[in-house]
Amino acid sequence: MELAVGNLSEGNASWPEPPAPEPGPLFGIGVENFVTLVVFGLIFALGVLGNSLVITVLARSKPGKPRSTTNLFILNLSIADLAYLLFCIPFQATVYALPTWVLGAFICKFIHYFFTVSMLVSIFTLAAMSVDRYVAIVHSRRSSSLRVSRNALLGVGCIWALSIAMASPVAYHQGLFHPRASNQTFCWEQWPDPRHKKAYVVCTFVFGYLLPLLLICFCYAKVLNHLHKKLKNMSKKSEASKKKTAQTVLVVVVVFGISWLPHHIIHLWAEFGVFPLTPASFLFRITAHCLAYSNSSVNPIIYAFLSENFRKAYKQVFKCHIRKDSHLSDTKESKSRIDTPPSTNCTHV
């Protein structure tokens, strides 16, 4: 369930195209569309690089050593975000670059369906991570028996199954639309009964945004309250660490809310009100698009690169590659080194 941006907008009726923006066209697509494509490109490049690095670091676990539950959730989040960036953004960018849909019915269904699946997987994973941290800090005595890889993998499986099921109406109702007065083709949601779409939009907002956000806030509020009570018995180093955790938590909640709130506002507005078609609303929809897409790029920064341990492991990845490349070069120069194994003194997460 994604935002439509052509002369067809959210809803079940064909709306007239909004007034054209004042600036002239750039490369034949308009200044606003060109800027949007540039932003998409930056989000794509940053997100693919960041999520690929996260996956690489987390995949380098020591043999026989189980991954932590936190790392498993971060890995799942990065895989979902990377898949979304690779499979959705390049195709969705054609909406801004071309006046009509040219990618066929399957791609039309797939990218909008996977957009919703990825959105739900990300949100549910963030909620699962908040519960995981709550158990680890507030119920530390019982956490060792609950926070095990098997339970985390089971949670990941449930997250994907639930997301795939919740997004299925999008795959069913998304399709090609051919206006009678035009030879153009659009990729658009078509619901026979408007009441069903209203119900689905509300359910997606409640179960795919509001409740997970409330759960995240509840868990982190409990965590911060627990840490505040324990601060008196902590060393300065430990106190600084807990404050860092509190700052990260604040960033997590704020970014989560900001990234997806405009997306849901537009869908609710379109279904239960009259969404205006003006240059201002057009820019608002573009902003909502970019914010939703950027969430897949900022997650690696929030959950990985703010961690000192992760940064150290990230540096070790490059050190290991440098050592291995150096060893391969040495073996070519000296036959006496052919049987010498490469250095494996690398840190794993």
Swiss-Prot record:
One of its GO terms (cellular component) is membrane. SMART domains: 7TM_GPCR_Srsx. Keywords: Cell membrane, Disulfide bond, G-protein coupled receptor, Glycoprotein, Lipoprotein, Membrane, Palmitate, Receptor, Transducer, Transmembrane, Transmembrane helix. Gene3D superfamilies: Rhodopsin 7-helix transmembrane proteins. Palmitoylated on at least one of the three cysteine residues present in the C-terminal part. It is a multi-pass membrane protein. It comes from the Eukaryota. Residues 58-70, 132-151, 222-248, 293-349 are cytoplasmic. Disulfide bonds join 108-187. GO terms for biological process: adenylate cyclase-activating G protein-coupled receptor signaling pathway; negative regulation of adenylate cyclase activity; neuropeptide signaling pathway; positive regulation of cortisol secretion; positive regulation of cytosolic calcium ion concentration; positive regulation of transcription by RNA polymerase II. Signal peptide: none annotated. It is found in: Cell membrane. Pfam families: 7tm_1 (PF00001). A lipid is attached at residue 320 (S-palmitoyl cysteine). The chain crosses the membrane at residues 37-57, 71-91, 110-131, 152-172, 201-221, 249-269, 272-292. The keyword Disulfide bond applies. Glycans are attached at residues 7, 12, 183. Residues 1-36, 92-109, 173-200, 270-271 are extracellular. GO terms for molecular function: G protein-coupled peptide receptor activity; galanin receptor activity; neuropeptide binding; peptide hormone binding. Receptor for the hormone galanin. The activity of this receptor is mediated by G proteins that inhibit adenylate cyclase activity. Belongs to the G-protein coupled receptor 1 family. Interacts with GRP39 AND HTR1A. This is Galanin receptor type 1. It comes from Homo sapiens (Human). The gene is GALR1.
